[in-house]
Amino acid sequence: MIQQESQLKVADNTGAKKVKCFKVLGGSRRRYATVGDVIVCSVRDVEPDSSVKKGDVVKAVIVRTRNDIRRKDGSTLRFDTNSCVIIDDKGNPKGTRIFGPVAREIRDRGFIKISSLAPEVI
């Protein structure tokens, strides 16, 4: 579960390393976000010569969470990190590569491009 003030790692090659969530999109008083949800973030830590700068406000979709993801068949899935991928206003990823596995729920939510760029879909 990701909420306001949560810090996430960035799982793409935009140059951002860490972002801080300050809004969960999808409702006026929505508190928590999980895999496949879109959040608004501020970039906190960047690599040199990156396409995004520190302090930029970006949209991101969550691809991994440490909290359990429950599936319809009763199985659960948990990752080691809270990670996201920075997207543009149309929902396409800004980077050209995705690092690490992503959950299958990403494809179910309509982020086909992210799931196709990922090395592994769990």
Curated annotation (Swiss-Prot):
<dbReference type="InterPro" id="IPR000218">
    <property type="entry name" value="Ribosomal_uL14"/>
</dbReference>
<dbReference type="Pfam" id="PF00238">
    <property type="entry name" value="Ribosomal_L14"/>
</dbReference>
<keyword id="KW-0699">rRNA-binding</keyword>
<dbReference type="InterPro" id="IPR019972">
    <property type="entry name" value="Ribosomal_uL14_CS"/>
</dbReference>
<dbReference type="GO" id="GO:0022625">
    <property type="term" value="C:cytosolic large ribosomal subunit"/>
</dbReference>
<protein>
    <recommendedName>
        <fullName>Large ribosomal subunit protein uL14</fullName>
    </recommendedName>
</protein>
<keyword id="KW-0694">RNA-binding</keyword>
<dbReference type="GO" id="GO:0070180">
    <property type="term" value="F:large ribosomal subunit rRNA binding"/>
</dbReference>
<comment type="subunit">
    <text>Part of the 50S ribosomal subunit. Forms a cluster with proteins L3 and L19. In the 70S ribosome, L14 and L19 interact and together make contacts with the 16S rRNA in bridges B5 and B8.</text>
</comment>
<keyword id="KW-0687">Ribonucleoprotein</keyword>
<comment type="function">
    <text>Binds to 23S rRNA. Forms part of two intersubunit bridges in the 70S ribosome.</text>
</comment>
<comment type="similarity">
    <text>Belongs to the universal ribosomal protein uL14 family.</text>
</comment>
<dbReference type="InterPro" id="IPR036853">
    <property type="entry name" value="Ribosomal_uL14_sf"/>
</dbReference>
<dbReference type="InterPro" id="IPR005745">
    <property type="entry name" value="Ribosomal_uL14_bac-type"/>
</dbReference>
<dbReference type="GO" id="GO:0006412">
    <property type="term" value="P:translation"/>
</dbReference>
<keyword id="KW-0689">Ribosomal protein</keyword>
<dbReference type="GO" id="GO:0003735">
    <property type="term" value="F:structural constituent of ribosome"/>
</dbReference>
